[in-house]
């Protein structure tokens, strides 16, 4: 299928959680549709994030791999500033970052809960806070949050219940914008 009908020529995108799996796929898809794309992730040691940025560059698009901790307001601010510096603007934010602990809720400790909510909920919120004013000022832009059908109903796998809870929060936050 040709993506020409979905051309994003001239658009600038930031994919949070773009190192592998769905995030990588979305980043490459945006680039295939002619968008310039910055990818970010917390983990960069394995070289996978840079590899995604290199693939995007090989498509003739501007790209960069930027390490960021989206649970930190300062890190998010620096990420957005660097993205705008590299791309010359920002039209699309795609929040794909995810982390989960495969534990039933009664077995999840406070540190695990904090890690889960810091990435999957607080991180998305901080990204919204940093990007929404930019998009409002330019009177255009799109924020796309990856949730999960698991966030719409109770998860059959009790070890995934904690993930379902934060993804329900992401779905509701998205509806509020």
Regions found by a protein language model. Give the residues of each.
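Substrate-binding pocket helix/loop in short-chain dehydrogenase/reductase
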Residues: 104-105, 112-114
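Conserved glycine-rich Rossmann-like NAD(P)H-binding loop of the short-chain dehydrogenase/reductase
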Residues: 35-50
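Residue(s) in the substrate-gating loop at a strand-loop-helix junction
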Residues: 148
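Conserved NAD(P)H cofactor-binding loop of Rossmann-fold oxidoreductase domains
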Residues: 96-101
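Active-site helix of classical SDR
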Residues: 128, 166, 174
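The beta1-alpha1 cofactor-binding region of Rossmann-like NAD(H)/NADP(H)-dependent oxidoreductases
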Residues: 46, 67-79, 110
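Canonical Rossmann dinucleotide-binding motif of NAD(H)/NADP(H)-dependent dehydrogenases/reductases
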Residues: 8-38
């Amino acid at each position: 299928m040709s993506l020409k009908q979905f051309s994003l020529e001239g658009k600038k995108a930031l994919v949070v959680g773009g190192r592998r799996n769905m995030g990588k796929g979305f980043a490459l898809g945006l680039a295939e549709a002619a968008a310039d794309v910055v990818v970010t992730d917390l983990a960069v040691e394995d070289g996978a994030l840079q590899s995604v940025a290199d693939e995007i560059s090989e498509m003739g698009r501007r790209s960069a791999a930027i390490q960021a901790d989206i649970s930190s307001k300062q890190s998010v601010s620096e990420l957005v500033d660097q993205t705008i510096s590299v791309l010359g603007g920002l039209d699309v934010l795609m929040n794909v970052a995810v982390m989960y602990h495969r534990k039933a809720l009664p077995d999840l400790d406070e540190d695990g809960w904090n890690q889960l909510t810091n990435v999957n909920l607080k991180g998305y919120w901080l990204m919204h806070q940093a990007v929404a004013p930019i998009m409002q000022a330019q009177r255009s832009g799109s924020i796309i949050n990856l949730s999960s059908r698991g966030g719409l109903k109770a998860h059959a796998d009790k070890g995934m219940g904690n993930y379902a809870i934060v993804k329900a929060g992401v779905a509701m936050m998205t509806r509020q914008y």
